[in-house]
Amino acid sequence: MTQIFHNMIAAILGISEKQIGQTLSLLNDGATIPFISRYRKEMTGGLDEVQIEAIQTHYEKLNETAKRKETIINTIQEQGKMTPELQKRIEETWDGTVLEDIYLPYKPKRKTRAEAARQKGLEPLATILMLQREPHPEQRAAGFVKGDVKDADDALKGARDIIAEQVSENERARNTLRNTFARQAVLTAKVVKGKEEEGAKYRDYFDCSESLKRCSSHRLLAIRRAETEGVLKVSISPNDEECVERLERQFVRSNNACGKQVAEAVQDAYKRLLKPSIETEFAAQSKERADDEAIRVFAENLRQLLLASPLGQKRVMGIDPGFRTGCKVVCLDAQGNLLHNENIYPHPPVNQSKEAFAKLQKMIEAYKIEAIAIGNGTASRETEDFLKRQTFNREVQIFIVSEQGASIYSASKIARDEFPEYDVTVRGAVSIARRLMDPLAELVQIDPKSIGVGQYQHDVDQSKLKKSLDQTVENCVNLVGVNLNTASSHLLTYISGLGPQLAQNIVNYRAENGAFSSRKELMKVPRMGAKAFEQCAGFLRIPDAKNPLDNTAVHPESYHIVEQMAKDLGCSVAELIADKELRLKIQPERYLSPTVGMPTLKDILQELEKPGRDPRGPIKVFEFDKNVRTIDDLRIGMELPGIVSNITNFGAFVDIGIKENGLIHLSQLAQKYVSDPNEIVSIHQQVRVKILGVDTERKRIQLTMIGVERI
């Protein structure tokens, strides 16, 4: 069975069977995807996280299919209907749809019209009709009039019910319909009478009809959401006449009276059984495809957001802006610890701008503030303007930071545990400041679904979504690595091989014993075994460790290689890291071994060049157009700076400094054809856009990047 799985996955993914086998062996041995991708390149042939995850997903699906086959075989055997040919066919089938078609005639059913007819003894009559040789079926039917069968017509009706069920369970018939649905099925949506006003936001779909195979995922999910809310009635249908004709060609072999009875049964089978069944199947398949696309977009957006550039360890002031309630101000040290908080009221209706400036000046001096993070919610632009009009004694950079999800964090158990004496406004301002310092460390504390970069996220398969987002967070955290001595338990949870319990044990050990001085010391943490250490060690950094390799992505299992390199050059490891000329003398091929190949050696040399390097780029200061405050200030043709706030499969939304985000449709991202917006833009990217259209009533803004100078 294992080899069959390897062959099938290799064929699907275009990856060699050897790579599949080695990867599955590592996964089954408890290795994580980030660990395999980073430290087992020789075994996998250099597969990345996406490929390894795909192997894992297909393997899990095949295992599920294997379990389903076992259930089907057992059920048919219990009925005493299993034959060697049938069992062989089930065992050789791995397509879920085909498997269910094979099983359908044997599947236990609630009482059907066909079953009721069989109990009346009408199956022999159905067989006579299907042979289509009897010239007078009514006369033959008269012989079945007894008991609950009232007359010949009643007998024929029961026989047709049996035939209809046989037609609906026929594999060839089902495949005929599937092929027709696949080619020509049309998705139709119509508004439910009386729901026009309530469902106004769905008015684009009130009377729409389009090819199912061409319907984009965002449209399909919007239509399905409206259907769930009772606003739309939705159907999927091919050409009914063509479908019936195809079925009749298969089952009706005579123009006589029996043939007409069979034709009537075929029409009933299509309308009552087959069409609803295949429609349900296609509805589920199209929904699954749309879910997968939406989840892919969400995961990519989340990845870009988590890997946004950090300001780093600077002393930051966080401001959660507001009008009537004032602006909540917090001051943090370079490690993100809260030092001070208070309110200022620079805006209407209070208008205490002088007092606000004096307070800010005092805080900036007292806490040696180096940067200010302003939340991008209510009063954000006004607060930014107020700050930029002031002259502080210290040079401070001003940044606008997304507040999305900050309110969720501020009311969370994590925030309450850290700041039990402070209210949600203080916690929210702290989150804004920390997002500027290190977006990854801060955002992992928030449910990804609350961050606001998804597309119909509440409508997709929630277990699939959670799995994908959790894996995305894990990949990002391990790509960057974390400081073992400052990382929160929540951040450590996502490190390869740890999880919640070991993460908390590390934090507890740190609290009791002080900072870790080496990676080896991890083995003293309760419940830290050799396997967990192997999986996590390379992703944990100790900046001031005695061994400089403890602050790199070089795995402890490879320290001996670096030590040998240093020894061969007559220097220490620290000197090797510090001296580029020494590193240039290294001949990597000298250190090849049966377990260490060039991929690992190249990674080691890259780490020695930039120890503990952060893959995230440097942060950039950004300013919105000062003349644009509301949607009413926009004019067609106006060019504006903006920040990409969300990406969907139909385009990108851009924050241009007002309440409403504008949309750059896929066709307006570039002169060339673009199939995926991620080819052109990324989350939080700074862009210049031109206004194409403004709908003030519907609060919609159309943007373009074509013909606009790139930032």
Task: Please place each PLM-identified region on the residue numbering.
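Long, highly charged, low-complexity intrinsically disordered interaction regions
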Residues: 2-5, 64-81, 91, 417-515, ...
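Short flexible coil/turn linkers enriched for glycine and charged/polar residues
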Residues: 16-17, 29-30, 96-97, 122, ...
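Short, ordered loop/turn segments at secondary-structure junctions
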Residues: 39-41, 130, 239, 321, ...
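Duplex nucleic acid-engaging cores and interfaces of nucleic-acid transaction enzymes
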Residues: 51-54, 61, 65-318, 324-422, ...
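Structured, non-catalytic alpha/beta "coupling" segments that mediate domain-domain communication
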Residues: 75, 89, 99-103, 226-239, ...
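A glycine-rich phosphate-binding loop feature that marks nucleotide/adenosyl-phosphate handling sites
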Residues: 179-187, 319-323, 377-382, 401-408, ...
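Single-stranded RNA-binding regions, centering on S1/OB-family and related RNA-binding modules
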Residues: 542-711
